[in-house]
Each structure stands twice: as C-alpha cells, then as structure tokens.
Amino acid sequence: MVKWKYILGEEALPHAADSADPHAPRIELRTEWLKTPGRNGRFSIVPIFLTFCGQGRGMSGADHTFPLYKEVIHMSTVFITGGSRGIGAAIARTFAFKGWNIAFSYLHSEEAAHALQNELSARGISVLAVRADAADPAQAAAFIERAVQELGAPDALVCSAGVALPQDVLTHVSDEDWRRVFSVNVDGLFYTVRAALPYFIRRRKGAIVTMSSMWGQIGGSCEVAYSASKGAVIAFTKALAKEVGPSNIRVNCVAPGVIDTDMNAHLSAEDMQALAEETPLGRIGTPYEVARCVRYLCSDGAEFITGQVIAPNGGIC
C-alpha cells in the first residue's frame, strides 16, 4: 500500500493590491489536479498548480502559474499508545496537523477515541483507533499488527499510555496498585516497543519516543510508585537507544513537568497553584507544549538526537 503527501512550493505569489483599490488585479483561479493513491486502494484528488489570470496593477494580463507542490514523498505514519485523551490526544492532533497518518490505542475512553478519529480523519489523513490495554502483551502486539495492516510500517512510535495513583505515602500503596502502575508504565512500554521494533529494524530507520515525567528524574514525595516507574522509562530509553542506534533508529524520552490534564485531577486547586508558583515560568504546562516536543523528536530536525531526555517543565527541575 502506497501513500503520498505533498510539500508546499516556495514560489511567492504575485503581490495583490488592496481589494479597495480600483486598479487591484482581478484574479481567476484555475486549478489542475493530480490523482494519488489513497487508503485501501482509493484515490485522492489534490491540486498541484494554481493559475492566476487577470489584469490590473502588478499583473500583465498573462497567466501566472505557480506550483503548489514541488515534490512527492512517502507519507509518514505514527503509532501512538494512549492517544484518546490528554497528552496522547494532543500528540495525535499535532501529528495530524503535519499530515501524518495515525494509529492510536485507547482503553476506556471509547467515545473520546471515536470522536478524535472522526476529527482527525476530516483532515484527509488515515486514522485508526484500536482498543488495547498496553499492559496486556497480546493486546499490545495486536495493536501494532492491526496498525501495520491498515497503515503500513510506522515511521515513528510514541508510547504515551500511562497511569498514576492518588498521592499517598508508600506504606499505603497496595500490591495491586504498585503492580498496575508498573504494568502500564513499564511493562506496557516493553510490550509495545518489542512488537514494533522489527518493523523499524527491517527498514533501518525510525523514531521512538517514550513518556516519562519530571518525577522520574527527581522523584516525588507520596509519588513513589509513579516516580519509580517513570525512572525505569528513562533507563529503558537510554539503553534501547544504544542497542538500536546502529540500525539508524532513534529513541528519546519526553519528561513533562506538571501539565494540565486529567491525570492531575486528583490535585486540588491549591496544589496546582503551588506547583505553578514553584515553576520558574510561573504556570502549568499544556498538553500541546508536550506534543510539540514529541513531534520534533520524530522529525528530520532531530535526526542526530538519540538517548536523550527532553523536559518541557517550565524550568522546575
């Protein structure tokens, strides 16, 4: 299955005078179209040229044709775990804005997942939403296999599925709660990357982004389970980057500070205000500020960056 996207041409359009000017050019648009392969064998029709014709100041009356798209390249595809809400949904939207095809998994938020799928599909990209528990090795692998079948091999993988516990002292953390945090935040990362890695290695390229937290870097009081699991994510990232670097695969980690998402819903308004005041930039971060870091690490601009932890945290650590 072949997918294509187009790069906007750099040629400048002729300057158009103020529309109130009686001598302003009268412009007629003529569009030529190109038929391109689309999802499941269907074709998309996209413009490749605009022709301006008209008379007035700055225009000779002759036709002016400008290419909208200069080259055709393979459309990029990203797989995202935990993509239906919060930071995961912001990541999906950020990639969609850049024209990437997207497969994302979700667990409980079925309504939000389908709403996001419809929203992103309206941009003309291919979007797949799959219900899968990252903590289940069979479901994690099934998500990757389904995504490959529908969209082809991934160019990037973003592991953003994660859970946290309400703040409490370690002696009040149950065995089940401890195991659940690690099963999603650490085991789920392992299961997902293990399933996807052969597709990256086979093509000898790709980017993997994991999701830690500032608590994984500095630790958080009454957040021992979460902090420990996110510290493990950082170690996983650094080790894997060394392992797959010779295959031209980059692995990096994003470790956000306090971000305005549902995961922090257990914090009181006073707690959030206190955290904002402790942040040098004086505010809480947004999911899209994290998402832009993730997308950058998957872009060509980061092609010599691997094994690193990027911390969008407002300077808090």
Regions found by a protein language model. Give the residues of each.
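Active-site helix of classical SDR
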Residues: V193, S229, T237
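Conserved glycine-rich Rossmann-like NAD(P)H-binding loop of the short-chain dehydrogenase/reductase
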Residues: K98-A115
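Conserved glycine-rich cofactor-binding loop
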Residues: S84-R85
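Substrate-binding pocket helix/loop in short-chain dehydrogenase/reductase
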Residues: D168-L170, S174-F182, D271, L275
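C-terminal helical subdomain
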Residues: C253, L275-I305, P312-G314
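Alpha-helical segment proximal to the catalytic Tyr-Lys
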Residues: P198, K242-P246, E303
